[in-house]
């Protein structure tokens, strides 16, 4: 069985990754499929059947063994892994192994996404260190993940963490949109979980991990800013700001529709992964 796919988007979740090959699970039917690095489906069935099919493909395609560290990219609500394409290419050009993870952010709760990532990390092979780069609300998902005890935490070290345009204090857009049924239908249960009220309840990232933040405003951010400003709640003196979550942060100018097309942002991410500082 071979057919081209679009890589999952909002209906398939990544549960296994090895040298750009991935096993995905459909969020509703729970069926699995094996995709090669060109997003061509090579097998379907249970996870074990897809895993066994991959083992056979290792010999057929002479897939090399992966070693060392892996950089995992986590997108935000309503997005998919494709948004990271310019960044993951830049990272690969620097020799990094990169896994941009698809998760159906508009279909399931944050707890369900954390369970998916737990399954994914449990099945990571031949890696001794994992670093994370998150975008927008992906930072909240990572905080949930790293503050829960899992078996995979003894398999490898957590290297470095980069938040890009994070919503660690919660999203004012999600707060406004959650009041409207249409937006709740479009964005799903995670919409309410990304509001400032809910974000405050999520523990911060564990200490001791090099953690940096990149602020790089997008065109959409500039368009939405006056609208959000008009309807946002009252800011209480002493409330945390995004800068309060890390002493290591940087602000970048941006003229690109996709923030990851910004060469300066790519440079800063590579710099932090190498040095642990901007």
For every predicted segment, state its role:
Residues 84-86, 144-146, 175-176, 225-227:
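Short amphipathic alpha-helical segments
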Residues 3-6, 12, 182, 186, ...:
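Short, aromatic- and cysteine-enriched interfacial helices/patches
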Residues 1-73, 80-90, 94-99, 121-124:
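Flexible, membrane-associating and regulatory peripheral segments of lipid-active enzymes
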Residues 206-278:
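C-terminal catalytic-base region of ester-bond hydrolases, centering on the histidine
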Residues 83-84, 112-113, 265:
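Residues at alpha-helix caps and immediate loop-helix transition turns in enzyme cores, especially N-
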Residues 76-77, 217:
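Structural motif
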Residues 81, 107-111, 259:
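Loop/helix-junction capping segments adjacent to catalytic residues or to phosphate/diphosphate-binding pockets
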Residues 72-75, 92, 97-208:
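Serine-dependent carboxylesterase/thioesterase catalytic core
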């Amino acid at each position: 069985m071979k057919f081209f796919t679009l890589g999952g988007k909002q209906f398939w979740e990544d549960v296994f990754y090895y040298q750009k090959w991935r096993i995905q699970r459909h969020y509703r039917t729970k069926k699995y499929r094996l995709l090669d690095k060109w997003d061509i489906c090579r097998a379907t069935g249970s996870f074990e059947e897809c895993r066994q099919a991959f083992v056979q493909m290792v010999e057929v395609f002479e897939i090399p063994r992966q070693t060392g560290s892996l950089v995992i990219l986590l997108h935000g609500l309503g997005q998919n892994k494709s948004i990271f394409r310019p960044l993951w290419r830049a990272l690969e050009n620097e020799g990094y192994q990169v896994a941009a993870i698809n998760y159906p952010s508009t279909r399931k709760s944050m707890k369900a996404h954390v369970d998916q990532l737990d399954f994914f990390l449990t099945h990571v092979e031949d890696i001794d260190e994992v670093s994370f780069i998150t975008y927008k609300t992906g930072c909240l998902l990572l905080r949930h993940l790293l503050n829960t005890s899992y078996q995979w935490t003894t398999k490898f070290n957590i290297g470095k963490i980069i938040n890009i345009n994070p919503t660690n204090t919660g999203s004012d857009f999600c707060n406004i949109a959650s009041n409207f049924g249409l937006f709740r239908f479009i964005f799903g249960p995670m919409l309410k979980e990304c509001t400032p009220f809910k974000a405050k309840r999520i523990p911060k990232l564990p200490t001791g991990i090099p953690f940096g933040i990149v602020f790089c405003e997008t065109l959409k951010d500039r368009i939405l800013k006056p609208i959000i400003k008009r309807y946002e709640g009252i800011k209480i003196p002493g409330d945390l700001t995004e800068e309060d979550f890390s002493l290591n942060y940087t602000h970048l100018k941006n003229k690109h529709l996709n923030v990851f097309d910004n060469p300066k942002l790519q440079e800063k991410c590579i710099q932090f992964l190498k040095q642990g500082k901007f």
